[in-house]
Curated annotation (Swiss-Prot):
HAMAP family, sorted: PyrG
Record-listed L-glutamine binding positions: 55, 355, 383-386, 406, 464
Natural source organism: Lactococcus lactis subsp. lactis (strain IL1403)
EC number: 6.3.4.2
Protein name: CTP synthase
Miscellaneous notes: CTPSs have evolved a hybrid strategy for distinguishing between UTP and CTP. The overlapping regions of the product feedback inhibitory and substrate sites recognize a common feature in both compounds, the triphosphate moiety. To differentiate isosteric substrate and product pyrimidine rings, an additional pocket far from the expected kinase/ligase catalytic site, specifically recognizes the cytosine and ribose portions of the product inhibitor.
Record-linked CDD domains: CTPS_N, GATase1_CTP_Synthase
Ranges of residues in domain Glutamine amidotransferase type-1: 293-535
TM regions (residue ranges): none
Length: 535
């Protein structure tokens, strides 16, 4: 079977949920027995989002092979339950840098390097590479931003050319457009959707399907009007309405026959998607019997997207305990030893996620200290693990001024130090310890029990600093347990205090591998204990 290509674009405005549409369609097609992969095109000039501010971009999602990517890849993985790779996120910066490198090497043999054909050819190559490296039957490529944006023009042209290159039966264009709801007048307006589809046609692409983003349902008459003006079959005009839970969306799209229309267009003979298990999960999620409050102490809490995988992993873990997770967003900059009880005291558990830089670290340390002294279930992630070690060094071992070398290069007690292979690294981007690495688990530890007594777990990392092994013996003597280490025993991966209800911190990012129907084990145990603690 020829590889099938589905392109998801957006018009009118950005942030309409194109990624959720792509992820939901991917789940439906996977449940038809098809092998699906998904890809995100980001037209910005950064090589990747690794050095971008979380306030600008939100979370950086890390793949198994160590690519720093757009947060939409997290949605793709969680919805479809697949592991993506470095070819699943392509930026203008990445493409242009590769082309310029080739030009400097003389690989274009003296040709004038241009947007067409050189940039468009490389974009088409990236699409095909993402499909071939995963042996996918179908690749869904989402283009970030809005059709008509100056920076996205080469991407749209590459998508246009794909139809002629691989055949009309192997390509489908899905355009996501907004329907404006004027609440005061009680009216729905379609002109933005019509003009957005017209703009796509001006670039040579006729949409095969429209997905209408709306707060309220659209009438059949309005659907038919949009279909006529946009030259799309009425049955291929799909509504994507606001929902209580994101995981309802695949079911809503299936109810409108979206996946069957896609299969018909692409000449795919695939059985109907069996969504029984997914539907049962959604029913469970919408009828949780318990509630648990978790304090998330972070430095980017004004933008929840900066912690989207963390919050989703907490929710997934809550599902397994039949509990809705109520997140109390606590700005680490506001936390002190004096007010920490007021800010986190009503929480049944505390999570201290990752981050970079000095701002907010003392507040995180105060929250960790509060959790340790009051036996509140605590989970530390990445920097959260490093600061767990710093707090223990200061307040249990009595090492006044102990810190991470990253945050205080003058400290007498650098309990967190730079990794040996990072000492001479000058570039910030793409140089961290990234991707999937193993952690060997200690017998009898809380971590090993959480992971069902596995000997080794593989989890994704994103860090440059590590626990300083010069202090390991002193920590162990004081009851600090190193419950997960690298197979060569050199890198600390998990730490815990065994005399607490749950006091565990890990260097890796377990949330990146959590799924709604398969929650990550460390998060699951954390929430289970927090639910018990809230009784």
């Amino acid at each position: 079977m020829s590889t099938k290509y589905i392109f998801v674009t957006g018009g009118g405005t950005s942030s309409m949920g194109k990624g959720i549409v792509a992820a939901s369609l991917g789940r439906l097609l996977k449940n038809r027995g098809l092998k699906v992969t998904v890809q995100k095109f980001d037209p910005y000039l950064n090589i990747d989002p690794g050095t971008m501010s979380p306030y600008q971009h939100g979370e950086v999602f890390v793949t198994d092979d160590g690519a720093e990517t757009d947060l939409d890849l997290g949605h793709y993985e969680r919805f479809i339950d697949i592991n993506l790779n470095k070819y699943s996120n392509v930026t203008s910066g990445k493409v242009y840098s590769e082309i310029l490198r080739k030009e400097r090497k003389g690989e274009y043999l003296g040709a004038t390097v241009q947007m067409v054909p050189h940039v468009t050819n490389m974009l088409k190559e990236k699409i095909k590479r993402a499909a071939t490296t995963t042996d996918a039957d179908i690749i869904i490529t989402e283009v970030g931003g809005t059709v008509g944006d100056m920076e996205s023009l080469p991407f749209i042209e590459a998508l246009r050319q794909m139809k002629a290159e691989v055949g009309a039966d192997n390509v489908m264009y899905i355009h996501t457009v907004p329907i404006l709801h004027l609440r005061a007048a009680g009216e729905l307006k379609t002109k933005i959707a019509q003009n957005a589809t017209k703009t796509l046609r001006e670039y040579g692409i006729q949409a095969n399907m429209l997905v209408l983003r709306s707060e309220v349902p659209i009438t059949t008459e309005m659907r038919d009007k949009i279909a006529m003006f946009c030259d799309v079959a009425p049955e291929a005009v799909i509504q994507s309405l606001d929902v209580e839970h994101l995981y309802q969306i695949p079911l809503n799209l299936q109810a409108q026959n979206m996946d069957q229309i896609v299969c018909d267009h692409l000449k795919l003979d695939a059985p109907k998607a069996d969504m029984t298990e997914w539907s049962a999960m959604v029913d469970h999620v919408m009828n949780l019997k318990k509630k648990v409050k978790i304090a998330l102490v972070g430095k980017y809490v004004e933008l929840p997207d900066a912690y989207i995988s963390v919050t989703e992993a907490l929710k997934h873990a809550g599902y397994s305990s039949d509990a809705e997770v109520d997140i109390n967003w606590v700005n680490a900059n506001d936390v002190t030893d004096e007010n920490v009880a007021e800010l986190v005291g009503d929480a049944a558990g505390i999570i201290v996620p990752g981050g970079f830089g000095h701002r907010g670290t003392e507040g995180k340390i105060a929250a960790i200290k509060y959790a340790r002294e009051n036996d509140v279930p605590m989970l530390g992630i990445c920097l959260g693990m490093q600061l767990t070690a710093v707090e223990f060094a200061r307040n249990v071992l009595g090492l006044e001024g102990a810190h991470s070398f990253e945050l205080d290069p003058e400290t007498k007690y650098p309990v967190i130090d730079i990794m040996r292979d990072q000492v001479d690294v000058e570039d910030m981007g793409g140089t961290l310890r990234l991707g999937l690495y193993p952690a060997k688990l200690k017998n009898g530890s809380r971590a090993k029990a959480a992971y069902n007594d596995a000997e080794v777990v593989q989890r994704r990392h994103r860090h440059r600093y590590e626990f300083n092994n010069k202090f390991r013996e002193d920590f162990e003597k004081a009851g600090f347990v190193f419950s997960g280490v690298s197979p060569d025993n050199r890198l600390v991966e998990i730490v815990e205090l065994s005399d607490k209800k749950f006091f565990v911190a890990c260097q890796y990012h377990p949330e990146l591998q959590s799924r709604p129907n398969r929650p990550e084990e460390l998060y699951t145990e954390f929430i289970r204990v927090a639910v018990e603690n809230s009784k």
